[in-house]
Amino acid sequence: MAERESEVVSTSGFKVRPLSKREPGAGSRESEISEGSTASLTTNPDKPKQSRLHELTNELRELEAKLRLGGGIERIEKQHKQGKLTARERIDLLLDKDSFSQEIGLLVAYDQYDGGAPAAGVVTTVGRVSGREVVVVANDATVKAGSWWPETIKKILRAQEIAMRSRIPIIYLVDSAGVNLPYQGGVFPGQYGAARIFYYNSIMRRYLKVPQISAVMGPCIAGGAYLPALSDVIIMVEGTSFMGLGGANLVKGATGQTIDNETLGGARAHNELSGVAHYRVKNDEEAIAKIREFVAELPRKYSGLRTGDSDSFSQSSVRSPQSSKRPPEDIYEIIPENHRQPYDMRALLDCILDDGHLDEFQAYYAKEIVTGHASIAGIQMGVIANARGMFRDPSGGAPRFGGIVYTESAEKVAYFIDTCNRHGTPLLFVQDVSGFMVGPEVEHSGIIRAGARFVEAMATAIVPKIVLTVNHASGAGYYAMAGQGFDPNFIFSWPTGRMGVMEGESAVQAVFGSELDRLKKNGQDPTPELEIEMRSVRETYERELDAKYAAARGFVDAVIAPEETRGALELALRVSVNYSGPHLGQFVVPASLT
């Protein structure tokens, strides 16, 4: 695995702002650090805003607006004519007004199926109902009647995992024709096929005590009927809902009996005859009101937030919330045009953290990685962030590349993670990492051992872990910085995020390097055929490094704009600390059962 980008350029100085408003003087940290001027990295009001992040954010918003239309205007109108709200209208009505919510997986499958599966036909959202954090899963009936693609299953499972890990209620708004039959091979079988949904339903119901509420607001057919049946509460809407293992046509074909769907499995049938459902309502609005009423009646569980008088290992302390030191719009100026160029990570954190305050841990050691304690909306957490640029080696060695993990920085972060884990402090990983350093010096310094220690500390920490990718997420450095394979509670990316084993030019060197060296030695240029092959590799990597590509495959929960970052991180923290037990893997079964 190639680890270091050879094209890291320029130098980056930095300074840490003091907690007080005093000017830096003799003996202050600012006067001690002289790794280049910070003037070029701070905001200049006369300087035009850099456009790369703006352009990518605008592209993202255009794509999101299109995807939120689901199957399109005509199908939305058809849904309304049937007396039904759309999936997103139902969610908007359900969630608390003026509260922040975060859709999970909006971009999933957007570039597949010839664009015919926007959001994979299901809307999954984290938000608040009656002041309580919840997860909502709503089938989008404007997209192939809400049927299930393979990616639909992945999104539902991801939503269930969020609910399980944090023990928060999950609400299903069911309006689905069941399996999308042409793609049943990716839906029905396998460890993570549709059956996994019902497995998670059962685990939540029996062992995790996660409230599950289902409102059947349209068809709910075949195996999909087990999803509401495994919930705590089932609400059905008169006239539009149907729940059954087989519809009227299947019944006629199998038994010869003629019956309509309403009589077979409508709201009245399941409330008056079978007893499968628990509530019957007249329309979608009444169903939503009933869900809100039920959530409000749920007993309040013990919160994972503390005010300082408790010593529980898995609680996060909370202080008075403050706004960020700098407005989020400044991020557009801080992130450079070229993703290889340096910038001031501490200036970026000023736009995210409460009052920009970072109580930096080992500030003078292994400066290529920033560690420290901070808070968002008053919730305290540990921050681990890759600094970019170049930094002097205090021992007189070669300058160090920011965004690269060295032996010392791996040891520094491992120690910091262990400390936060002992204190029950959630972790925020701000990723801009190009990999681990390579070469004889670092190999002989024991970087493999230090890197393994870094990975182990991160992987085994039982506190909530939240990831924000701002730029590079490459090589084994991505893994160590709580990559998706290590089950962080949430993983977000800015539009500038670039997730991949290496950059395109590095891939070209890895694949064609020997041939290029031979040609150069013989004084020859690459042939046209070789140029085409190399260009193809570059273009493939550039396409697959795009944050939207990662989001389309569920590698990140959401691509978010800079202005949404504090809201998304606050909600993620509040969701995560609902559960005061260990956060490890998809869920942890209570110790009393082991």
Which functions belong to the PLM regions below?
Residues 2-22, 35-314, 319-594:
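Ligand-binding clefts of soluble mixed alpha/beta catalytic domains
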